[in-house]
């Protein structure tokens, strides 16, 4: 039930998130002249629909930058929808963690067929959509099916903290390789004060060994990144992520990050 609400949600001033169109969330950050899109979902169609929804409510603006937070397909596979958007800027910047392209292609191309078959069982894809069949995946309703695409980053995040400005918006990035994904980042917006936890934080105990065959996660290292984010982004007033819903309030954010850190220790 908690994953069921879908639509466009305001997370912080100038920061909106579309939930319920894919297993992951698509985030739109308002820049000086356009949008920064974070994690353009898993397929072209599931990314195009949230972008259209955002335009209906937030107005038309060119996409100036895209951030791939990590190397799992549900966070980059819909990039073609951004390229196909008539409002996209010609000099689009694509930010990703160092090692993103290698990790994404090795997992989704070289091992893609085997992982795809296992994912059918892991996510219960053939089950009927009812109370006795497919209900939820925990992280979201269900993985998308459709055309998957990828793009080469123009800017790499390779250290912590790494400051960057995208269309007038100040970002502080955390480089978190070998956490929930082989290549991953999180970030903080020091002006609006939201912290984006990518997928190193969630509303469930995330799997350390995925049945579909993704690389095994180092729980202690992962926990260390969450603790680093808790200290680095201590002024955060909101924490939100690639899946599920935000936590509001500075004290609640600190408590949530501490609980997530301890979960993986």
Predicted features and spans:
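Active-site metal-binding motif and surrounding structural segment of the metallo-beta-lactamase
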Residues: 8, 33-34, 44-94, 158
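Conserved beta-strand hairpin/beta-sheet module of binuclear metal-dependent hydrolase folds
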Residues: 5-60, 185-199
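Divalent-metal (often Zn2+) His-rich catalytic cores of metallo-beta-lactamase-fold enzymes
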Residues: 163, 188, 194, 204, ...
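Second-shell loop/turn segments in exported
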Residues: 37-42, 66, 209-215, 254-257
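Metallo-beta-lactamase
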Residues: 10-11, 95, 101-177, 221-233
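Active-site neighborhood of phospho(di)ester-bond hydrolases with catalytic His/Asp-centered motifs
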Residues: 38-40, 62-74, 95-97, 196-198, ...
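Active-site environment of divalent metal-dependent phosphoester hydrolases
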Residues: 45, 71-77, 101-104, 180-182, ...
């Amino acid at each position: 039930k908690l994953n069921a609400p879908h639509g466009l949600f305001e997370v912080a001033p100038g920061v909106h998130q579309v939930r319920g169109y894919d297993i992951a969330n698509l985030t739109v950050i308002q820049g000086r002249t356009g949008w920064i899109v974070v994690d353009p979902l898993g397929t072209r169609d599931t990314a195009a629909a949230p972008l259209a929804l955002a335009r209906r409510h937030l107005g038309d603006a060119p996409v100036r930058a895209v951030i791939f937070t990590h190397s799992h397909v549900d966070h980059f596979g819909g990039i073609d929808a951004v390229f196909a958007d008539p409002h996209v800027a010609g000099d689009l910047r694509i930010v990703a963690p160092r090692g993103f392209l290698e990790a994404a292609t090795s997992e989704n191309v070289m091992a893609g067929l085997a992982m795809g078959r296992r994912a059918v069982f892991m996510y219960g894809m053939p089950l009927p959509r009812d109370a006795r069949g497919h209900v939820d995946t925990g992280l979201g309703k269900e993985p998308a099916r459709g055309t998957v695409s990828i793009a080469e980053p123009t800017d790499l995040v390779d250290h912590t903290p790494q400051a960057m400005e995208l269309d007038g918006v100040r970002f502080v990035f955390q480089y978190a390789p070998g956490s929930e994904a082989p290549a991953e980042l999180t970030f903080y917006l020091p002006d609006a004060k939201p912290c984006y936890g990518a997928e190193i934080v969630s509303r469930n105990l995330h799997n350390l060994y995925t049945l579909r065959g993704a690389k095994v996660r180092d729980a202690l290292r992962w926990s260390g990144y969450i603790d680093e984010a808790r200290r680095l982004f201590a002024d955060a007033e909101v924490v939100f992520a690639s899946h599920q819903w935000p936590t509001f309030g500075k004290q609640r954010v600190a408590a949530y990050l501490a609980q997530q850190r301890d979960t993986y220790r």
